[in-house]
């Protein structure tokens, strides 16, 4: 299984046991607000907002919450002004980590991130220190039960499919150029094919395989970062063997 597929599997299992819906809603509200501020409140002409709304609805966010977040972004309602800041650094075992934040207090956020990284066996680096190791891509998960690999590839080739990962037991992972994420989603919707977790992802060019101890530390660090109120997303180039993954799943 590829490093990206393993990480996707771990993330799904984390999400299945994560009860912090309030924290998730906070992050989604920030993303909707920022998207509306940057590109306007009409999702038909704002792909980032459309994706944020789709993600919020997939996570059962009430429409009233979504509309209020949009209006805060467009200035129709008063609210906090968020600044997007990306931090880069290294984690246990030398893995590269990218941390995307949305904050109304830059000083608070950088202090929190630095503390979490230091406590978790990592360190903050300068801007650009690890970003060059990743490429921004569109990512969609399609249940294997919904369609065959050949049919999925045929369906999406003209829509913008770049790569189809098929080594996960439950899901195909569709990777696209960022600009082709919406056309690929539309092709799936029009064909009646269910999908999950449509998002913009950061895919590493290469992975760093960790032993059990460092993998455990890295997962704990990433979990702590993701639970920070100001953190929107965390990406890494962590990989692990099937045996290490099995050990961690049993814990």
Curated annotation (Swiss-Prot):
<dbReference type="InterPro" id="IPR029072">
    <property type="entry name" value="YebC-like"/>
</dbReference>
<protein>
    <recommendedName>
        <fullName>Probable transcriptional regulatory protein CT1665</fullName>
    </recommendedName>
</protein>
<dbReference type="GO" id="GO:0003677">
    <property type="term" value="F:DNA binding"/>
</dbReference>
<dbReference type="Pfam" id="PF01709">
    <property type="entry name" value="Transcrip_reg"/>
</dbReference>
<keyword id="KW-0963">Cytoplasm</keyword>
<keyword id="KW-0804">Transcription</keyword>
<keyword id="KW-0805">Transcription regulation</keyword>
<dbReference type="GO" id="GO:0005829">
    <property type="term" value="C:cytosol"/>
</dbReference>
<keyword id="KW-0238">DNA-binding</keyword>
<dbReference type="InterPro" id="IPR017856">
    <property type="entry name" value="Integrase-like_N"/>
</dbReference>
<dbReference type="InterPro" id="IPR049083">
    <property type="entry name" value="TACO1_YebC_N"/>
</dbReference>
<comment type="similarity">
    <text>Belongs to the TACO1 family.</text>
</comment>
<dbReference type="Pfam" id="PF20772">
    <property type="entry name" value="TACO1_YebC_N"/>
</dbReference>
<dbReference type="GO" id="GO:0006355">
    <property type="term" value="P:regulation of DNA-templated transcription"/>
</dbReference>
<dbReference type="InterPro" id="IPR048300">
    <property type="entry name" value="TACO1_YebC-like_2nd/3rd_dom"/>
</dbReference>
<dbReference type="InterPro" id="IPR002876">
    <property type="entry name" value="Transcrip_reg_TACO1-like"/>
</dbReference>
<dbReference type="InterPro" id="IPR026564">
    <property type="entry name" value="Transcrip_reg_TACO1-like_dom3"/>
</dbReference>
